[in-house]
Amino acid sequence: MSNSFVLVINSGSSSLKFAVIDSVSGDAVLSGLGECFGLSDARMSWKFNGEKKEISIEGDDSHHKIAIGKLVGLTEELGLAQDIVAVGHRIVHGGEKFTKTVRITEEVTQEIEKLADLAPLHNPAGAIGIRAAVEAFPSLPQFAVFDTAFHQTMPQRAFTGAIAKELYTDFGIRRYGFHGTSHYFVSREAAKMINKPIEESSFISVHLGNGASVCAINNGESVDTSMGFTPLSGLMMGTRCGDLDPGIIEYLLKKGWSQEKVFNSLNKASGFLGVSGLTSDARGILEAMEEGHEGAALAFQVFTYRVSKYIASYLAALDSFDGIIFTGGIGENSMPIRREILKNLKLLGFVEDVKGNEDARFGNAGVIATSELLGAKALVIPTNEEWVIAQQSVELL
């Protein structure tokens, strides 16, 4: 073992993902999940050396605090504690305040809490995780890595909304973007695959999972992205609507819908689930399509068409074009969805490598198509956000 391990924590509103990452290799030495926090069946499971274990979480204290407290004993029991040099926290929203990874102090934690209005489901939970980890691991330096940070290089023309200026100056309403850590990682890996310096490489990165976003990366920097002020905008997703005429919200309110009902529908009952009337899972959509389900077929078409439209529009943001990167659970594994997206981009001249597309699944990277017209490639690259968090934490030691 080397003294290069980082405990990476991703604290959700009712869950806690954790991993001990080797910051040199990117390997997850230990990985686990705490879930159902706040409920009677709260539990915590982990995987170490191929063996899985699960325990119940009981007690009157915060379940986040209890779970992170148990990590102290667990890392000692597994012989990992002495090699952990830092704790890295994934924080969803850094606003305009945090443009890069920072070492956590009380002031930083308070600033993260102040940004709760911009990410009410995520930032309060992130701050709870930070406070619990600082108490549990007082001797370890701790760092915050922000999903929004990579997108802080967007030019003003990309992040500015066409709205009254005071909505930005008074309320901070602008495009922030998310999945930044993922887009950052895969763009660096893509540059290595095509043997070019990242500073001279330009890609359109497509992160497709239950949440989904596209990012235009020009000479290694984010210059535009599909998610905006919140993770609700942009692409159609598992249960989220993506881009929508805002007049629809007023229309539904006038029809007697409550604000809560409107936004619950747009966040939790739209996307794949809403269009198909069946499921939010892309695998279920594809299976139902094969059985002739019309709603599933329509959801597939709407989803892939919208991704293709975003890719095509982001060519306007680039000075050159080296390729498209597919990542995220769907992007890394769904051959039919990748194929349909590239098929829609027929004017770009991508020719599928059928074997390459079949092989680039289940954790395997690869080239799945090439455009002789543009000299660009379509790549599949598994994301590794935890490794980025570990690396950026170690860099600040």
Curated annotation (Swiss-Prot):
Localization terms from the record: Cytoplasm
Cofactor list: Mg(2+); Mn(2+)
Record: residues binding Mg(2+): N10, E385
Binding site for ATP: K17, H207, L208, G209, N210, G211, D281, A282, R283, G329, I330, G331, E332, N333
Coiled-coil region list: none
EC number: 2.7.2.1
Listed GO CC annotations: cytosol
Site residues, Transition state stabilizer: H179, R240
Domain of life from the UniProt record: Bacteria
Keyword annotations from UniProtKB, A to Z: ATP-binding, Cytoplasm, Kinase, Magnesium, Metal-binding, Nucleotide-binding, Transferase
Secretion signal span: none
Pathway annotation: Metabolic intermediate biosynthesis; acetyl-CoA biosynthesis; acetyl-CoA from acetate: step 1/2
Reactions catalysed: acetate + ATP = acetyl phosphate + ADP
PROSITE patterns with a match to the protein in the record: ACETATE_KINASE_1, ACETATE_KINASE_2
One Gene Ontology term from the biological process aspect of the record: acetyl-CoA biosynthetic process
Subunit structure: Homodimer.
Function comment: Catalyzes the formation of acetyl phosphate from acetate and ATP. Can also catalyze the reverse reaction.
PANTHER family from the UniProt entry: ACETATE KINASE
NCBIfam families given in the database record: ackA, PRK12440.1
Protein name, per record: Acetate kinase 2
UniProt source species: Vibrio parahaemolyticus serotype O3:K6 (strain RIMD 2210633)
